[in-house]
Amino acid sequence: NLTRRIARAAGNLGEGICIEIGPGPGGLTRALLLEGARKVIAIERDRRSIEALQDLVDAADGRLEIIEADAMDIDLTTLGDAPRRVIANLPYNVGTPMLLSWLKRAEAFESFTLMFQKEVAERISASPSTPQYGRLSIAARWRAEVFPLFDIPPRAFTPAPKITSQ
């Protein structure tokens, strides 16, 4: 299962908190809880998604909290106890600005397990002397250890986008 694979890639979920950005209907949220997350704080701005997540909140025995907000407006370093792990299938149009803002406070986070459009992921993880190397890879490598995990084909999503994710 793809969502469980992503959750396992995030490391030891049993300590600290997992911050999930844009949980939508909760596929990754369920996987985080099934993989033993002690606490998941999910930030969602879409009221319909929040309503869809309510059954999961009820079943999670206090391990899931939903914050109705735009994640760009929240200081994630104020949420829960460290260690903080950010795990997200980021909206592609705001993924890069979010990452850059979090990297400014990288010491407040244990890890980031993030999905981007493959071309953006390649720019984030690019090595010097490659065509993709630039401002984004410099910022990411300066503040974090960066490595791509796996490709996710368009057919893994409904509706299927025209791009591969990583």
Predicted regions and their residues:
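Catalytic cores of RNA-modifying enzymes
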Residues: 1-166
